[in-house]
Amino acid sequence: VPTKERLYIMCVIALSPVGERVDKSTLADMWDTNPDGAGIAFIDETKTIRTYKTMDKDDFINVATATIDKYHQSSPILLHCRIATHGSVCIANTHPFNVDNHTVMAHNGIIDCVEDDPKGQISDTRMFINTWLRYLRPTWLDDPAMCEYVGDIIGWSKLAFLTTNANLRKSYYIINESDGNWIDG
């Protein structure tokens, strides 16, 4: 049974631009408030997105710290800790998720514009990717009207994307960024 405090907590995303770091204390805080799985995404030396997902706090902190140490000067780093609201607590529902071969995404909030999985196993984020995002053209992230549209349909949720798509202008994007907070960044 969730405590009253947990009822108001949503997943947490940290997207650190090149040159910025998330420290161990922040990683621990992220996990402690969102202990239902964690994931990391970064762009390696071959310009390939690499992801890592775990259900273990110490593993998350150790891998995230090593990844940040090695890649923070060359890649934005996307970190996500989940608190389950839809779907089972498992690696398959742990963010970030592949949107296509060049893009991953993490989500904060609850997405109401998709049907719930009838079996209760698939998260709202996975349902949204499978029923909406996979059908958008790969360059939609550079289209302000499309970003606004997606922002409108997800309500107060936030989406953070990391991409190596050569047809996009940037390597990361945030939908509904103005509804979130940048901390020391």
Labelled PLM ranges:
Residues 50, 87-89, 114-116, 170-171:
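Short helix/loop capping segments that flank catalytic or ligand/cofactor-binding pockets
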Residues 55-67, 79-100:
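Short acidic (Asp/Glu) patches
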Residues 40, 93-112, 149-185:
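Conserved catalytic micro-motifs used in adenylation/nucleotidyl-transfer and phosphoryl/amide-
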Residues 112-137:
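Glycine-rich phosphate-binding loop plus the immediately following alpha-helix
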Residues 136-145:
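Short, charged, surface-exposed loops that flank catalytic or proteolytic processing sites
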Residues 15-18, 80-86, 108, 114, ...:
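Fold-independent oxyanion-binding glycine-rich loops
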Residues 5-67, 77, 176-185:
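Extreme N-terminus nucleophile/cap motif
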